[in-house]
Amino acid sequence: VSNAEDYMRFALMLWNEGEYNGQRIVSPDSIALMRQPHIQTGVLSNQVDGMGFGLGVGVVMDAEKTILLDRESDFFWSGFYGTNFFVSPQSGLVAVIMSQNQPPPASPWPGSFGVFIAPAFGFLGI
């Protein structure tokens, strides 16, 4: 349980390799370990093409295979009711959305706000 401001601080700290507002919170090695895929492809039945699972975050492993985020090394996490964050180290984009919507099919909201913001920033080449 948190608020949008704290969630953004957390996401910015991850983007800045463990540092926030000039203070080291987590070592760069720990951040790098978080962002590495740790579950092999095919282990999970609901794994999305091009995506992997790091330690506490989803990671883009093959940008050509995924439609949600477009750069390798992008990472993210989303909650069941639509709260999301993602970090794109290469583009410098850090985003947080706080929502409370049931996932499809109960709601038309697709569950990942990357579907909406990626085209807005040209990530999908659309």
Specify the residue positions occupied by each region the protein language model found.
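Catalytic loop of the DD-peptidase/beta-lactamase superfamily, centered on the K-T-G motif
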Residues: 1-126
